Curated annotation (Swiss-Prot):
Modification type 2,3-didehydroalanine (Ser): residues: S148
Superkingdom, taxonomy of origin: Bacteria
Keyword tags: Cytoplasm, Histidine metabolism, Lyase
Annotated Pfam families: Lyase_aromatic
Keyword Cell division: no
First-level EC class: lyase
Cross-link (5-imidazolinone (Ala-Gly)): A147-G149
Entry's Gene Ontology molecular function annotations: histidine ammonia-lyase activity
EC number: 4.3.1.3
Pathway given in the UniProt record: Amino-acid degradation; L-histidine degradation into L-glutamate; N-formimidoyl-L-glutamate from L-histidine: step 1/3
Name of the protein in its database record: Histidine ammonia-lyase
Annotated organism of origin: Gloeobacter violaceus (strain ATCC 29082 / PCC 7421)
Catalytic activity: L-histidine = trans-urocanate + NH4(+)
Length: 514
């Protein structure tokens, strides 16, 4: 995807996760490249030519799944496609949020733009117009087994193109036809192959995966910031992060985390104040942070690599090779790559939360904190300080341990045994979102407690990264003098993390973290 003034040009093969976020969250409008539209025209012309002959082609002149051998007469091929959307719209549960639906629209347009799916240009153009004009289909979050792709969610998405289903426009949920009309658009009547082309793919799980990877990459850096602040507040040592030490075990993520921790704690008067103390080494949750954070960062990088490929892949079936005159039936719709990556992502985030909660315990427990008051309150007894904040972190970490169980190892056959291995990719992606939400809050609790602890250390200043982190948090959350409703403070820190403000301020002072 290329930036053209204030637009992003969609060509089917160069979409980045940052581009997706800009469209899904930031509302950046999209155009189709002329080259992509030409490829789509050629692909469609080939499908039209097939219809003039007597060839049997799956999904064009046959039924679907178990009904693969049922021949469909030429007069019914268009009704076949609409029937497919209606029967596949079997999703249940809460609808996906707006940014997820926008990401789904974008990804479906991107895969169709490569010109291997046989849709008409006007069908693809309507998909893009819906995205640009804010027509967001109501898509239930449950119902996909991850092969053939995300059929149920994408069917709910695609129904709106035909005037069916429901969509949100300007905050109001309307019937599909009314939603299109509100945006100045008209529904289409599906042509041969188009229903299948619109719903056969991994765009629901991939949309969630891309958005979660983007958050996870930021959380990995914020986990390093939280650790740095806790290290300084508990009078820990930087020696376990030295470059020559980490060169002996050169995992990329470990190297990055160690460098970040050194940068964030640079020029720390707190660390310098106890340079000659008799403590030999810190607890694992501090000393081994690069090894644990780094392993999670490497896992996040793996997931990001899978997602980067998937969002620029063609995941339809069958695929139309107009240049060679072939229609190839295969399995690009199978979500196993995204399912496995999502499970790995959830495990990585669960571990970031796990070790963060242990550091929070070291902050609030006077037996571990090297001189800080119990629960970080100077009036313990009358006030309980951050006692129960650690309970909340423990609860979220426990929930993550359940959710970290992989979904991709499960498979339940469907379509009367024809589709006898499925990925459960959307289940994996949805779990990863919840784990990410929990992880964000666990790290927010550590940051909140670390800020309080740094205040309690008095006039000794922390390192340059920790110092900025403290300043940003204090601008939103005041020092805890007496008990107040803690959940509000946690959510304020979460907001600083989620909107990028905290990380941006720290990186402005320290340079870009790894």
């Amino acid at each position: 995807m290329k930036l053209l003034t204030d637009w992003l040009v969609l060509d089917g093969c160069s979409l980045a996760v940052d581009d997706l976020v800009a469209v899904a969250r930031g509302g950046v409008p999209v155009r189709l490249s002329p080259a992509s539209l030409e490829l789509v025209r050629r692909s469609r012309a080939f499908v039209e030519a097939l219809l003039e002959g007597d060839e049997i082609v799956y999904g064009i002149t046959t039924g679907f799944g178990y009904f693969k051998n049922r021949r469909i007469p030429r007069s019914a091929v268009e009704q076949l496609q609409q029937n497919l959307l209606m029967s596949s719209a079997a999703g249940l549960g809460e609808p996906f949020g707006r940014e997820v639906v926008r990401a789904m629209l974008l990804l479906r347009a991107n895969t169709l733009a490569q010109g291997y799916s046989g849709v008409r240009p006007e069908t693809l153009q309507l998909l893009v117009a819906m995205l640009n004009r804010g027509v967001h289909p109501v898509v239930p979050c449950r119902g996909s087994v991850g092969a053939s792709g995300d059929l149920a969610p994408l069917a709910h998405l695609a129904l709106v193109l035909t005037g069916e289903g429901e969509a949100e426009v300007g905050g109001e949920v309307l019937p599909g036809a009314a939603a299109l009309a509100r945006a100045g658009l008209e529904p289409i009547r599906l042509g041969a192959k188009e229903g299948l082309a619109l719903i056969n793919g991994t765009q629901a799980m991939s949309a969630l995966g891309a958005l979660t990877v983007h958050r996870a990459q930021r959380l990995a850096k914020l986990a390093d910031l939280a650790c740095a602040m806790t290290l300084e507040a508990t009078l820990g040592s930087r020696s376990a992060f030295l470059p020559h030490f980490h060169r002996l075990r050169p995992h990329p993520g470990q190297q990055s985390s160690a460098r970040n921790l050194l940068v964030l704690t640079e020029d720390s008067a707190l660390i310098a104040s106890h340079a000659g103390c008799d403590r030999v080494q810190d607890a694992y949750s501090l000393r081994c942070a690069p090894q644990v954070h780094g392993a999670s960062l490497d896992a996040i990088s793996y997931a990001a690599g899978v997602i980067a490929i998937e969002i620029n892949s063609v995941t339809d079936n069958p695929l139309i090779f107009a240049d060679t005159g072939q229609v190839v039936t295969g399995g690009h719709f199978h979500g196993q790559p995204v399912a496995m990556a999502s499970d790995v992502l959830a495990i990585a985030l669960a571990e970031l939360a796990d070790i963060s909660e242990r550091r929070t315990e070291r902050l609030v427990n006077a037996d571990y904190s090297n001189g800080l008051p119990m629960f970080l309150t100077e009036a313990g007894g009358l006030h309980s300080g951050y006692m129960v904040a650690q309970y909340t972190a423990a609860s979220l970490v426990s929930e993550n341990k359940v959710l970290a169980h992989p979904a991709c190892v499960d498979s339940i056959p469907t379509s009367a045994g024809q589709e006898d291995h499925v990925s459960m990719g959307l289940t994996a992606a949805r779990k990863a979102v919840t784990v990410c939400d929990n992880c964000e809050r666990v790290i927010a609790i550590e940051l909140m407690c670390a800020a309080q602890a740094l205040d309690l250390r008095g006039k000794l200043t922390p390192g340059r990264g920790s110092r900025v982190g403290l300043e940003v948090i204090r601008a939103a959350v005041p020092h805890l003098e007496s008990d107040r409703i803690v959940s509000r403070d946690i959510e304020k820190v979460v907001e600083l993390m989620a909107d990028g403000h905290l990380l941006e301020a720290v990186e402005a002072a320290c340079g870009r973290l790894d």
